[in-house]
From Swiss-Prot:
The keyword Zinc does not apply. Belongs to the anthranilate phosphoribosyltransferase family. The gene is trpD. Keywords: Amino-acid biosynthesis, Aromatic amino acid biosynthesis, Glycosyltransferase, Magnesium, Metal-binding, Transferase, Tryptophan biosynthesis. It is an enzyme of class 2 (transferase). Pathway: Amino-acid biosynthesis; L-tryptophan biosynthesis; L-tryptophan from chorismate: step 2/5. Mg(2+) 1 binds at S93, E227. Catalyzes the transfer of the phosphoribosyl group of 5-phosphorylribose-1-pyrophosphate (PRPP) to anthranilate to yield N-(5'-phosphoribosyl)-anthranilate (PRA). Anthranilate 1 binds at G81, N112. This is Anthranilate phosphoribosyltransferase. Its cofactor is Mg(2+). GO terms for molecular function: anthranilate phosphoribosyltransferase activity; magnesium ion binding. The keyword GTP-binding does not apply. Homodimer. It comes from Methylorubrum extorquens (strain PA1).
Length: 337
């Protein structure tokens, strides 16, 4: 572990690691051969100084090399966020993924249990009856038959167990909070990617581009949500055709009313599952509005809608026609088969 000590000394000095050095350092971290003290010191020093783009690229490369992959159809996307916005909101990206899949775009959703909220994607899907922690073959079947799968991070990133105790002991977020969302096991190249810190938006979009993504909307709500929000404007950094573009979205521009954070506040997995089911049954409320907005973005990123307004309209129709309800029912059935 002399090489890791060298990398630790570089980070502790305040200097950045090269992409190759970061890849090597995270290979060591994920191998389980680094002591807890060394791992804690390394992650703390990185967090205090702030991670460079090359360090994130190297770290994600190490994560992806060790993950359990899933075969996904061409054109599959993910709708995911870094979490950590402490909003306690409904499971927006989960419902948006269901709506997007109901519109014919395969969604390889990657997520975990709750970190800073009461209900993560894994929690609410389990409450809805979806079997969690499936092997790659079963997930490929979900994608083929339901157009949607849920890849449980703990199943696909087993090497994370080596750093989990250290992360639990540290009273702050580390680079690993962004590595999971950047390491989709299905290798999707189109994403709606929510960030809880506005400073992350541009660098993480560039990281995704470096790692092979072709079309990305990285979003941060003005209220702090790691989603496209309906309480006000959302800042977007878009990767399209190799170019980067910055713009702001307002839900009123696509016919959706403004909401408050209280309107979007959820509860435990059972509460959120009931709310999600109610939307699929036709309930019109703030949860529906924010979900169709994010699904609309997913359709744009997938190339299945020419504008956000068109994407939102298609997501609305997926609910009203019962298609979205059918997508969830198929996912529940196939995942438990």
């Amino acid at each position: 572990m002399d090489a890791f000590k060298t990398h630790l000394a570089i980070v502790a000095s305040g200097a950045p690691l090269s992409r190759e050095q970061a890849r090597a350092a995270f290979d060591d971290l994920l191998s389980g051969e680094v002591t807890p003290i060394q791992a804690g010191a390394f992650l703390t020093a990185l967090s205090v100084r702030g991670e460079s783009e090359d360090e994130i690229v190297g770290a994600v490369s190490a994560m992806r090399a060790r993950m359990l992959p899933v075969a996904a159809p061409e054109g599959a996307i993910d709708i995911v966020g870094t979490g950590g916005d402490h909003s306690g909101s409904y499971n927006v990206s989960t419902l948006a993924a269901i709506l997007t899949a109901a519109c014919g775009v395969p969604v390889a959703k990657h997520g975990n249990r709750a970190a800073t909220s009461r209900s993560g994607a894994a929690d609410v899907l389990a409450a809805l009856g979806v079997k969690i922690g499936l092997p790659p073959e079963a997930l490929a079947r979900c994608l083929s038959e339901a157009g949607l799968c849920f890849m449980f991070a703990q199943t696909h990133h087993g090497a994370m167990r080596h750093v989990a105790p250290v992360r639990t002991e540290l009273p702050f977020r580390t680079i690993f909070n962004m590595l999971g969302p950047l390491s989709n096991p299905a290798g999707v190249t189109a994403q709606v990617f929510g960030v809880s810190r506005p400073a992350w938006a541009e660098p993480l979009t560039r990281v995704l581009a470096t790692l092979g993504s072709r079309r990305v909307w990285t979003v941060h709500g003005s209220d702090g949500l790691d989603e496209i929000t309906t309480t006000g404007p959302t800042a977007v950094v878009a990767l399209e055709n190799g170019a980067f573009r910055h713009f702001t979205l307002d839900p009123r521009e696509v016919g959706l009313p403004l909401a408050t954070l209280d309107d979007l506040r959820g509860g435990d997995p059972e509460h959120n599952a009931a709310a999600l089911g109610a939307v699929l049954e036709g309930t019109r409320n703030a949860y529906r509005d924010i979900a169709v907005l994010n699904a609309g973005a997913g359709l744009v990123v997938a190339g299945a809608a020419g504008s956000l307004a068109e994407g939102v309209a298609r997501a609305q129709e997926a609910i009203d026609s019962g298609a979205a309800r059918g997508t969830l029912a198929r996912l529940v059935a196939v995942s438990n088969a």
